[in-house]
Amino acid sequence: MFSRRDFGRMALAAGPLSMAFGARIDSSVSGVQLGTITYSFRDLPRTAGKDNVDDLIAALTACRIGEIELYSPNIEPAPASAVKPAAAGPAYGVARGARTPPTPEQIAARKAEREALRQWRISTPASYYQAVRAKFDAAGINVFAYTLGFNADFTDDEIDAGFAQAKGLGVDLIASSTTLPMAQRVAPFADKHQVRVAVHGYANVKDPNQFGSPESFAKALAMSKYMRVNLDIGHFTAANYDAVAYVRENHEHITHLHIKDRKRNDGTNEPFGDGTRRLSRCWC
Protein backbone atom coordinates (compact mmCIF):
# COMPACT_ATOMS: atom_id res chain seq x y z
CA MET A 1 0.00 0.00 0.00
CA PHE A 2 1.29 3.46 -0.90
CA SER A 3 0.65 6.63 1.07
CA ARG A 4 -0.21 9.97 -0.54
CA ARG A 5 3.38 11.06 0.14
CA ASP A 6 4.74 7.89 -1.54
CA PHE A 7 2.72 8.73 -4.65
CA GLY A 8 4.12 12.26 -4.59
CA ARG A 9 7.72 11.04 -4.47
CA MET A 10 7.13 8.57 -7.31
CA ALA A 11 5.40 11.23 -9.36
CA LEU A 12 8.22 13.74 -9.01
CA ALA A 13 10.65 11.12 -10.28
CA ALA A 14 8.47 10.00 -13.19
CA GLY A 15 6.93 13.36 -14.03
CA PRO A 16 8.86 14.50 -17.13
CA LEU A 17 8.25 11.20 -18.95
CA SER A 18 4.60 10.91 -18.00
CA MET A 19 3.86 14.52 -18.93
CA ALA A 20 5.35 14.11 -22.39
CA PHE A 21 2.13 12.54 -23.63
CA GLY A 22 -1.16 14.41 -23.88
CA ALA A 23 -3.53 11.48 -24.35
CA ARG A 24 -6.61 11.73 -22.16
CA ILE A 25 -6.24 9.78 -18.93
CA ASP A 26 -9.32 7.63 -18.40
CA SER A 27 -9.98 7.17 -14.69
CA SER A 28 -13.56 5.95 -15.07
CA VAL A 29 -14.58 2.54 -13.72
CA SER A 30 -17.58 0.68 -15.13
CA GLY A 31 -18.97 3.91 -16.52
CA VAL A 32 -18.54 5.85 -13.26
CA GLN A 33 -16.21 8.84 -13.59
CA LEU A 34 -13.72 8.82 -10.72
CA GLY A 35 -11.38 11.66 -9.90
CA THR A 36 -9.93 13.58 -7.00
CA ILE A 37 -9.94 16.95 -5.34
CA THR A 38 -6.33 18.08 -5.53
CA TYR A 39 -6.44 18.97 -1.84
CA SER A 40 -5.59 15.27 -1.49
CA PHE A 41 -2.07 16.14 -2.71
CA ARG A 42 -1.51 18.83 -0.07
CA ASP A 43 1.68 17.07 1.12
CA LEU A 44 3.53 18.02 -2.06
CA PRO A 45 6.42 20.43 -1.38
CA ARG A 46 5.83 24.16 -1.77
CA THR A 47 8.09 27.09 -2.58
CA ALA A 48 7.27 30.61 -1.40
CA GLY A 49 5.68 32.72 -4.09
CA LYS A 50 5.21 29.80 -6.49
CA ASP A 51 2.35 27.54 -7.53
CA ASN A 52 2.91 23.77 -7.67
CA VAL A 53 0.96 22.97 -10.83
CA ASP A 54 3.80 21.03 -12.47
CA ASP A 55 4.39 18.84 -9.41
CA LEU A 56 0.65 18.30 -9.07
CA ILE A 57 0.32 17.20 -12.69
CA ALA A 58 3.21 14.79 -12.22
CA ALA A 59 1.50 13.28 -9.16
CA LEU A 60 -1.87 12.99 -10.89
CA THR A 61 -0.27 11.38 -13.92
CA ALA A 62 1.59 8.85 -11.77
CA CYS A 63 -1.71 7.95 -10.09
CA ARG A 64 -3.52 7.77 -13.46
CA ILE A 65 -6.13 10.32 -12.41
CA GLY A 66 -7.79 12.03 -15.35
CA GLU A 67 -10.53 14.09 -13.67
CA ILE A 68 -9.93 16.69 -10.97
CA GLU A 69 -11.54 19.27 -8.77
CA LEU A 70 -8.72 21.83 -8.76
CA TYR A 71 -7.93 23.19 -5.28
CA SER A 72 -7.19 26.93 -5.42
CA PRO A 73 -3.89 26.90 -3.42
CA ASN A 74 -2.33 24.66 -6.07
CA ILE A 75 -2.44 27.46 -8.62
CA GLU A 76 -1.77 30.36 -6.26
CA PRO A 77 1.60 31.58 -4.94
CA ALA A 78 2.38 29.75 -1.70
CA PRO A 79 2.71 32.01 1.35
CA ALA A 80 5.84 31.70 3.45
CA SER A 81 3.83 30.04 6.23
CA ALA A 82 2.96 27.13 3.90
CA VAL A 83 6.46 26.44 2.62
CA LYS A 84 7.94 23.05 3.42
CA PRO A 85 10.44 20.66 1.84
CA ALA A 86 9.39 17.30 0.42
CA ALA A 87 10.02 15.43 3.68
CA ALA A 88 8.14 17.83 5.93
CA GLY A 89 4.69 17.38 7.45
CA PRO A 90 1.38 18.65 6.08
CA ALA A 91 0.95 22.31 5.16
CA TYR A 92 -2.00 24.71 4.98
CA GLY A 93 -3.05 24.21 8.58
CA VAL A 94 -3.18 20.40 8.40
CA ALA A 95 -1.38 19.38 11.58
CA ARG A 96 -0.72 16.23 13.54
CA GLY A 97 -1.05 16.64 17.29
CA ALA A 98 -1.49 19.83 19.29
CA ARG A 99 -0.41 23.19 17.91
CA THR A 100 0.92 26.07 19.93
CA PRO A 101 -0.99 29.36 19.60
CA PRO A 102 0.51 31.79 17.07
CA THR A 103 2.59 34.68 18.32
CA PRO A 104 1.55 38.29 17.63
CA GLU A 105 4.27 38.43 14.97
CA GLN A 106 2.89 35.31 13.28
CA ILE A 107 -0.64 36.70 13.39
CA ALA A 108 0.54 39.92 11.74
CA ALA A 109 2.50 38.00 9.11
CA ARG A 110 -0.48 35.81 8.22
CA LYS A 111 -2.73 38.85 7.99
CA ALA A 112 -0.28 40.38 5.52
CA GLU A 113 -0.15 37.11 3.58
CA ARG A 114 -3.93 37.04 3.39
CA GLU A 115 -4.09 40.56 2.01
CA ALA A 116 -1.35 39.78 -0.52
CA LEU A 117 -3.34 36.76 -1.71
CA ARG A 118 -6.48 38.87 -2.03
CA GLN A 119 -4.68 41.40 -4.20
CA TRP A 120 -3.13 38.61 -6.29
CA ARG A 121 -6.54 37.10 -6.93
CA ILE A 122 -8.04 40.44 -7.92
CA SER A 123 -5.18 41.49 -10.20
CA THR A 124 -4.14 38.24 -11.93
CA PRO A 125 -5.36 38.21 -15.55
CA ALA A 126 -7.46 35.51 -17.18
CA SER A 127 -4.49 34.54 -19.34
CA TYR A 128 -2.75 33.07 -16.29
CA TYR A 129 -5.64 30.69 -15.60
CA GLN A 130 -5.94 29.83 -19.26
CA ALA A 131 -2.26 28.83 -19.26
CA VAL A 132 -2.82 26.67 -16.17
CA ARG A 133 -5.73 24.92 -17.87
CA ALA A 134 -3.60 24.34 -20.96
CA LYS A 135 -1.04 22.47 -18.84
CA PHE A 136 -3.68 20.09 -17.51
CA ASP A 137 -5.14 19.60 -20.98
CA ALA A 138 -1.69 18.78 -22.37
CA ALA A 139 -1.27 16.16 -19.64
CA GLY A 140 -4.62 14.53 -20.46
CA ILE A 141 -6.26 15.70 -17.24
CA ASN A 142 -9.72 17.28 -17.26
CA VAL A 143 -10.43 20.09 -14.81
CA PHE A 144 -14.02 19.37 -13.80
CA ALA A 145 -14.43 22.05 -11.13
CA TYR A 146 -12.54 24.75 -9.26
CA THR A 147 -12.43 24.53 -5.46
CA LEU A 148 -12.50 27.87 -3.68
CA GLY A 149 -13.52 28.22 -0.04
CA PHE A 150 -15.54 31.42 0.24
CA ASN A 151 -14.77 32.60 3.78
CA ALA A 152 -16.14 35.54 5.75
CA ASP A 153 -12.99 37.57 5.07
CA PHE A 154 -13.64 37.66 1.31
CA THR A 155 -14.41 41.10 -0.09
CA ASP A 156 -16.97 41.45 -2.86
CA ASP A 157 -14.15 42.13 -5.33
CA GLU A 158 -12.46 38.90 -4.26
CA ILE A 159 -15.67 36.90 -4.66
CA ASP A 160 -16.08 38.35 -8.14
CA ALA A 161 -12.47 37.47 -8.95
CA GLY A 162 -13.11 33.87 -7.89
CA PHE A 163 -15.72 33.51 -10.62
CA ALA A 164 -13.36 35.08 -13.15
CA GLN A 165 -10.74 32.50 -12.13
CA ALA A 166 -13.18 29.64 -12.75
CA LYS A 167 -14.07 31.01 -16.17
CA GLY A 168 -10.39 31.46 -17.00
CA LEU A 169 -9.88 27.79 -16.12
CA GLY A 170 -12.69 26.90 -18.51
CA VAL A 171 -15.07 25.51 -15.89
CA ASP A 172 -18.63 26.45 -15.01
CA LEU A 173 -18.55 24.96 -11.51
CA ILE A 174 -17.04 26.17 -8.25
CA ALA A 175 -17.07 23.75 -5.31
CA SER A 176 -16.92 25.55 -1.98
CA SER A 177 -16.70 24.75 1.70
CA THR A 178 -18.55 27.79 2.95
CA THR A 179 -21.36 28.90 5.25
CA LEU A 180 -24.97 29.89 4.75
CA PRO A 181 -24.27 33.63 5.28
CA MET A 182 -21.43 33.51 2.76
CA ALA A 183 -23.54 31.53 0.28
CA GLN A 184 -26.07 34.35 0.42
CA ARG A 185 -23.31 36.78 -0.58
CA VAL A 186 -21.98 34.45 -3.28
CA ALA A 187 -25.31 33.61 -4.96
CA PRO A 188 -25.71 36.98 -6.77
CA PHE A 189 -22.25 36.53 -8.29
CA ALA A 190 -23.23 33.06 -9.48
CA ASP A 191 -26.20 34.68 -11.22
CA LYS A 192 -24.00 37.41 -12.69
CA HIS A 193 -21.40 35.01 -14.10
CA GLN A 194 -23.79 32.10 -14.79
CA VAL A 195 -21.39 29.77 -12.99
CA ARG A 196 -22.67 27.04 -10.68
CA VAL A 197 -21.59 26.91 -7.04
CA ALA A 198 -21.76 23.55 -5.24
CA VAL A 199 -21.67 23.87 -1.46
CA HIS A 200 -19.77 21.18 0.43
CA GLY A 201 -21.13 19.94 3.73
CA TYR A 202 -19.57 18.63 6.92
CA ALA A 203 -20.86 16.71 9.92
CA ASN A 204 -21.35 19.76 12.15
CA VAL A 205 -25.12 20.14 12.07
CA LYS A 206 -25.35 21.92 15.44
CA ASP A 207 -24.14 25.21 13.96
CA PRO A 208 -27.06 26.73 12.00
CA ASN A 209 -24.64 28.55 9.69
CA GLN A 210 -22.90 25.38 8.51
CA PHE A 211 -23.87 23.13 5.62
CA GLY A 212 -24.47 19.51 6.53
CA SER A 213 -28.17 18.78 6.86
CA PRO A 214 -30.67 18.31 4.03
CA GLU A 215 -32.42 21.45 5.25
CA SER A 216 -29.24 23.53 4.96
CA PHE A 217 -28.66 22.31 1.41
CA ALA A 218 -32.26 23.19 0.54
CA LYS A 219 -31.62 26.75 1.72
CA ALA A 220 -28.62 27.00 -0.60
CA LEU A 221 -30.58 25.68 -3.56
CA ALA A 222 -33.28 28.29 -2.96
CA MET A 223 -30.76 31.15 -3.25
CA SER A 224 -30.13 30.86 -6.99
CA LYS A 225 -30.75 28.56 -9.92
CA TYR A 226 -26.95 28.20 -10.08
CA MET A 227 -26.55 26.84 -6.54
CA ARG A 228 -25.82 23.12 -6.24
CA VAL A 229 -24.70 20.48 -3.71
CA ASN A 230 -21.31 18.77 -3.50
CA LEU A 231 -22.32 15.89 -1.24
CA ASP A 232 -19.66 14.37 0.97
CA ILE A 233 -21.22 11.03 1.79
CA GLY A 234 -18.83 10.38 4.68
CA HIS A 235 -19.68 13.59 6.50
CA PHE A 236 -23.36 13.16 5.65
CA THR A 237 -23.35 9.68 7.17
CA ALA A 238 -21.42 10.87 10.24
CA ALA A 239 -24.16 13.47 10.75
CA ASN A 240 -26.66 10.56 10.87
CA TYR A 241 -28.33 11.16 7.51
CA ASP A 242 -28.97 8.61 4.76
CA ALA A 243 -26.69 9.43 1.83
CA VAL A 244 -28.33 6.91 -0.51
CA ALA A 245 -31.79 8.34 0.07
CA TYR A 246 -30.53 11.90 -0.37
CA VAL A 247 -28.78 11.07 -3.65
CA ARG A 248 -31.89 9.35 -5.01
CA GLU A 249 -34.15 12.25 -4.08
CA ASN A 250 -31.84 15.12 -5.06
CA HIS A 251 -29.53 13.80 -7.77
CA GLU A 252 -30.45 16.60 -10.18
CA HIS A 253 -28.99 19.14 -7.72
CA ILE A 254 -25.80 17.18 -6.90
CA THR A 255 -22.81 17.97 -9.11
CA HIS A 256 -20.46 15.36 -7.66
CA LEU A 257 -19.81 13.22 -4.60
CA HIS A 258 -16.89 13.23 -2.20
CA ILE A 259 -16.29 9.63 -1.22
CA LYS A 260 -15.13 8.59 2.20
CA ASP A 261 -16.33 6.01 4.70
CA ARG A 262 -17.24 7.12 8.22
CA LYS A 263 -19.15 5.83 11.19
CA ARG A 264 -22.40 7.42 12.28
CA ASN A 265 -22.64 9.74 15.30
CA ASP A 266 -19.71 11.88 14.07
CA GLY A 267 -17.57 8.76 13.90
CA THR A 268 -14.07 8.33 12.57
CA ASN A 269 -12.94 7.91 8.98
CA GLU A 270 -12.67 4.23 8.09
CA PRO A 271 -11.10 2.19 5.28
CA PHE A 272 -13.49 1.83 2.35
CA GLY A 273 -16.11 -0.76 3.21
CA ASP A 274 -15.69 -0.53 6.99
CA GLY A 275 -17.92 2.48 7.65
CA THR A 276 -21.67 2.67 8.14
CA ARG A 277 -22.68 3.48 4.56
CA ARG A 278 -22.31 0.97 1.73
CA LEU A 279 -20.47 3.20 -0.73
CA SER A 280 -21.41 1.35 -3.91
CA ARG A 281 -25.10 2.07 -3.39
CA CYS A 282 -24.43 5.80 -3.78
CA TRP A 283 -23.48 5.51 -7.43
CA CYS A 284 -25.58 2.58 -8.58
Predicted feature descriptions by range:
Residues F2-L173, D191, V195-A198, A203:
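N-terminal pre-domain/capping segments
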Residues G31, T36, A190-T276:
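Acidic/histidine-rich catalytic cores of soluble enzymes
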Residues T47-D51, S123-A126, D153, S177, ...:
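Conserved phosphate-coordination/catalytic loops
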Residues S72, F150, T178, I254, ...:
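Residues that line or immediately flank small-molecule/substrate-binding pockets and catalytic motifs
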Residues A78, Q184, G267:
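Glycine/Thr-rich phosphate-binding loops of Rossmann-like dinucleotide-binding domains
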Residues S127-V132, M182-Q184, G212-F217, Y241-A245, ...:
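Alpha-helical scaffolding within the catalytic cores
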Residues L173-T179:
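Catalytic beta/alpha-barrel core
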Residues T179-F189:
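Active-site-adjacent beta->alpha loops and helix N-cap segments on the catalytic face
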